Design a protein with these regions (language model features):
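Repeat-blade elements of multi-bladed beta-propeller folds
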Residues: 1, 29-51, 70-98, 118-151, ...
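Blade/loop signatures of beta-propeller domains
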Residues: 1-21
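Short loop/turn segments that connect beta-strands within beta-propeller blades
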Residues: 56-59, 102-105, 163-166
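Surface-exposed loop and turn segments in beta-propeller and other repeat-based domains
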Residues: 25-26, 113-116, 172-193
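Beta-propeller domains
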Residues: 10-16, 47-60, 67-68
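A structural motif specific to WD40 beta-propellers
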Residues: 19-21, 61-64, 107-111, 170-171
């Protein structure tokens, strides 16, 4: 990201003035892919084990922990309430589930399967806009393709929109047409296509044109 120095309060001498305030060792993790989200004095972050943490931004102390089904790779998306404090949290996990939590307590409000394909995964952050949440669909089918008896490949990347209050699907847009059988390898395992075109990152909303 490029930005003119005069537009940025973070000037060149600033790093020399920074001091470590606190650290947090995430249990059971040897990597971190989820970027922290800060709101209302709280740091929200997912982890390799599937745990989602709410940490005090000043002290690093844990307010609460929620355990998802699998690794959370995207950032936690925060919906603010009327008081401009975090009200709800939205995120997806590596097994393709999407979640809505109560920001104050970490209580589960709803949990939904993003797509019926068994190898669906979610790596990008969810995007909240008006009454909907937009979810990018990706897959681990490339791993399944290693197996000689796996009929590859049928997954289709895309984006879905769900109702933020209920988690019910409003619409679903796939990147490619539905896969069809193409040919049989060795007369036993069928090959399928087209497939793929996963969406790894977060969708972008054009508020002016509602796109």
């Amino acid at each position: 990201r490029s930005q003119k120095i005069e537009l940025n309060e973070f000037s060149q001498p600033t790093p020399e003035l920074l001091e470590l305030a606190w650290t947090f060792a995430v249990p059971g993790a040897d990597r971190m892919r989820s970027q922290p989200t800060v709101g209302g004095g709280v740091v929200f972050i997912g982890s390799q084990s599937g745990s989602v943490y709410a940490l005090d931004a000043k002290t690093g102390c844990v307010w609460w922990t929620f355990n998802a089904s699998s690794e959370v790779r995207g950032s936690i998306s925060v919906e603010l309430g009327t008081d401009d404090l975090p009200e709800s949290l939205f995120f997806g996990d590596f097994q393709g589930y999407i979640y809505k939590l109560e920001a104050l307590t970490g209580k589960l409000i709803w949990r939904r399967r993003a797509d019926p394909h068994p190898l669906t995964t979610i790596t990008g952050s969810l995007v909240i806009y008006e009454d909907r949440v937009f979810i990018p669909l990706s897959s681990t089918e490339i791993v399944g393709a290693i197996e000689s008896d796996y009929e590859c490949c049928t997954f289709r990347g895309g984006v879905i929109a769900v109702d933020k209050n209920t988690g019910d699907t409003r619409w679903r847009l796939y990147s490619v047409d539905k896969a069809r059988t193409q040919y049989s390898e060795s007369g036993e395992v069928m090959s399928w296509g087209p497939s793929g075109v996963p969406v790894w990152s977060s969708p972008t909303i054009d508020e002016k044109r509602k796109l």
